Amino acid sequence: QIAARYGVAPLTITDTHPTAGTAITVASGFWRRLYTCTIDKFVPELREGGWSWQDSIRYTQPGCEVIGGTSGSPIISVDTKEVIGINNTGNESGGRCTVNNPCEVDEMGRITAQKGASYGQELYQIYTCLDANNEINLDRTGCLLNKPR
C-alpha cells in the first residue's frame, strides 16, 4: 500500500539486536539531512530529566551529531537497510541527567555525561510482542516492551 500510494518502498524494522560497529544512517525528514556513522556502544541505562531508557544506542562522533528536530528519525543499517532504532536525544551542553543532557549509567551504577553524545532506542523488541494477527500484545509471554504504568 505504501509503495502504491507514495511511490517509495517501506522500510523494514529489524527483528534482531544490532551490534556495536554497525554502520548506520540517521535520516532526518524534518531537516532533510542524513547523518552517517557507526554504533559506538550500548548504554545499560540512559537518563534524561524524568525519563529512563535501557540498552540505548550511542553513536560514534564525528558523523552523527544530530540536532534538535531529529528526534523520531529512523536509525537505518547501511548494510541491511533495516530500521534498527529511533533517534531520540543528545547531550547538548555537557549537563548530567537533565533535559537535553542525558547521562549514562553503567552496570555498576556509575554516572557519566558526554557533551555532544547522541543516542537512539532499539526497535527489535516490537517483534517479541506481536501476536498471531501481527498486533502488539504487551501481555504476550516474552514481550520485551515496557508496559504503561
Question: Could you describe each region identified by the protein language model?
Answer:
Residues 2-10, 33-128:
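Active-site region of chymotrypsin-like
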Residues 10-39:
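Short glycine/Trp-rich loop-beta-loop segment that forms part of the substrate-binding cleft
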Residues 113-149:
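Low-complexity, Gly/Ser/Thr/Pro-rich intrinsically disordered linker/tail segments
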